[in-house]
C-alpha cells in the first residue's frame, strides 16, 4: 500500500495537514474549484519563484493565501509592485477580497516538489538524466535528509522505447506512518515527449499529530 499511495495523502491527520483550511456546505465544489484555479494561477505567474506549496484559508469576507517560496523576492518584486499586480488579478478572477502572504522556505533542497521541478528543468535543458538525479540526491543528503528516492519515466535520453530509471540513497520507509516523507511530482516537456519526475524525501520519524 505504501508503495502505490501518495505519501502525503496517506499521512493526512497522522503527521500531515490539508493545504485547504476551510469548511463549506452547499457551495463546496465552487470553493474547491476556486482553490484549484488560485494554485494554478500562482504557480504559473511565479514559475521561477520555486513555490513549494500554497495554503488557502477562508474567513467570511476574505481569503487568506500563504505562498511558501524559496525565492520570495521574485514574487514580491521591487517595492512590492509585482505582488500588488497579482492581487488585483486574483480579486478580478474570484471576485473576493484576498490576503496574500509570502513565506520563505529555509531549506529548498529538502522539499520534494522543488527537487522534482529542478530535475525537470534540467532535463528540458538537455542535461543527462543520471547527472541531474545524482546531483539533486547528493545535495539533499548533504543538507540533512535521511534518505531520498528519485524516479524518471519516459523517453530518457531520446530512446525509442520509454522506460523508468530510479536512483536511491539512504532509507525511505514508505510503509511507516510516523516517517516524515515529503513527495513531489513534476513533468519535463522535452523534444522527445514528456518525462515524469517523482521524488520521495525521508526527513526522519516524527510524532503523530494526535499524540
UniProtKB/Swiss-Prot annotation:
Function according to Swiss-Prot or TrEMBL: Binds the lower part of the 30S subunit head. Binds mRNA in the 70S ribosome, positioning it for translation.
Source organism: Ehrlichia ruminantium (strain Gardel)
Gene Ontology CC: cytosolic small ribosomal subunit
Family statement drawn from the similarity comment of this UniProt entry: Belongs to the universal ribosomal protein uS3 family.
InterPro entries: KH_dom (IPR004087), KH_dom-like_a/b (IPR015946), KH_dom_type_2 (IPR004044), KH_sf_prok-type (IPR009019), Ribosomal_S3_C_sf (IPR036419), Ribosomal_uS3_bac-typ (IPR005704), Ribosomal_uS3_C (IPR001351), Ribosomal_uS3_CS (IPR018280)
Protein name: Small ribosomal subunit protein uS3
Subunit and interaction comment: Part of the 30S ribosomal subunit. Forms a tight complex with proteins S10 and S14.
UniProt cross-references to NCBIfam families, sorted A to Z: rpsC_bact (TIGR01009)
Annotated KH type-2 domain residues: 38-106
One Pfam family per UniProt: KH_2
UniProt entry tagged with the keyword Ribosomal protein: yes
HAMAP family according to UniProt: Ribosomal_uS3_B
One of the protein's GO biological processes: translation
Gene3D superfamilies, A to Z: 3.30.300.20, Ribosomal protein S3, C-terminal domain
Record's keyword terms, sorted: Ribonucleoprotein, Ribosomal protein, RNA-binding, rRNA-binding
Domain of life of the source: Bacteria
GO molecular function: mRNA binding; rRNA binding; structural constituent of ribosome
Amino acid at each position: 500500500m505504501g508503495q502505490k499511495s501518495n505519501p502525503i495523502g496517506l499521512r493526512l491527520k497522522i503527521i500531515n495537514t490539508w493545504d485547504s483550511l476551510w469548511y463549506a456546505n452547499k457551495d463546496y465544489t465552487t470553493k474547491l474549484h476556486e482553490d484549484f484555479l488560485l494554485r494554478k494561477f500562482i504557480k504559473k505567474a511565479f514559475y521561477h519563484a520555486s513555490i513549494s506549496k500554497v495554503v488557502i484559508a477562508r474567513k467570511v469576507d476574505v481569503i487568506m493565501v500563504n505562498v511558501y517560496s524559496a525565492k520570495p523576492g521574485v514574487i514580491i518584486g521591487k517595492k512590492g509592485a509585482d505582488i500588488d499586480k497579482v492581487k488585483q488579478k486574483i480579486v478580478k478572477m474570484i471576485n473576493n477580497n484576498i490576503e496574500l502572504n509570502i513565506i520563505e522556505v529555509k531549506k529548498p533542497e529538502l522539499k520534494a516538489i522543488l527537487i522534482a521541478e529542478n530535475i525537470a528543468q534540467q532535463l528540458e535543458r538537455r542535461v543527462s538524466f543520471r547527472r541531474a538525479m545524482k546531483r539533486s540526491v547528493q545535495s539533499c543528503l548533504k543538507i540533512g535528509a535521511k534518505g531520498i528516492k528519485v524516479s524518471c519515466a519516459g523517453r530518457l535520453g531520446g530512446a525509442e522505447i520509454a522506460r523508468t530509471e530510479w536512483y536511491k540513497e539512504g532509507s525511505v520507509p514508505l510503509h511507516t506512518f510516523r516517517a516524515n516523507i515529503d513527495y513531489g511530482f513534476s513533468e519535463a516537456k522535452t523534444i522527445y515527449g514528456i518525462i515524469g519526475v517523482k521524488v520521495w524525501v525521508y526527513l526522519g520519524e516524527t510524532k503523530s499529530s494526535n499524540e
